[in-house]
């Protein structure tokens, strides 16, 4: 009986430690956030502006984003916070979606823009051949767990 109790208690702590590791590792290894001054300097170059908002149908307490998104010809600039997690990707889509069930069918048509390692105030350089006019939505997606994080329609 004592062996069974020890087995389950140690197993529970192992599972909790593993889950905490998955959650905390991206936070601990995230690059430094962009300075507000850097973000504000890029405001004059913006071609599109939108906002990530909490409360989308694909959001929950672990998957959300909130803040202003500015798009220039050469950068995606974000001033706000995104729920931390592993393996985040930025995509552009031609259709506004706000849930993984809506994104998965059109993922093959979406344009992968960049990996995302920051969860607060970031500036992502963009390949010069990305044409934002061909899309209308920016989306953040967790590739590892196939989870929608947030999206915003910019045109």
What are the roles of these predicted feature ranges?
Residues 127-150:
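Short, exposed beta-strand-loop hairpins at the edges of beta-sheets
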Residues 100-128:
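An anionic, turn-rich surface loop/hairpin at beta-sheet edges
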Residues 89-91:
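Beta-strand signatures of extracellular beta-sandwich domains
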Residues 1-9, 28, 93:
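Polybasic/polar functional segments that serve as interface/processing modules
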Residues 24-72, 104-108:
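Transition segment at domain starts
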Residues 74, 81, 93-96, 143-145:
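Solvent-exposed coil/turn segments that connect beta secondary-structure elements
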Residues 5-23:
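Hydrophobic membrane-insertion alpha-helices, especially the h-region
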Residues 66-87:
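Short, surface-exposed binding/anchoring microloops in extracellular/periplasmic proteins
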């Amino acid at each position: 009986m004592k062996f069974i109790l020890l087995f389950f208690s140690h197993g529970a702590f192992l599972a909790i430690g593993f889950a905490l590791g998955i959650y905390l590792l991206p936070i601990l290894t995230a690059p430094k956030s962009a300075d507000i001054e850097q973000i504000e300097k890029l405001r004059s170059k913006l071609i599109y502006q939108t906002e990530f908002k909490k409360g989308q149908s694909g959001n929950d307490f672990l998957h959300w984003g909130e803040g202003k998104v500015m798009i220039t010809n050469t950068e995606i600039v974000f001033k706000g916070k995104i729920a931390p997690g592993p393996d985040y990707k930025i995509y552009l889509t031609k259709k506004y979606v706000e849930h993984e069930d809506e994104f998965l069918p059109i993922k093959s048509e979406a344009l992968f823009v960049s990996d995302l390692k920051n969860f607060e105030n970031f500036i992502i350089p963009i390949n010069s051949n990305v044409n934002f006019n061909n899309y209308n939505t920016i989306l953040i997606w967790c590739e590892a767990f196939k989870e929608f994080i947030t999206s915003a329609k910019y045109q």
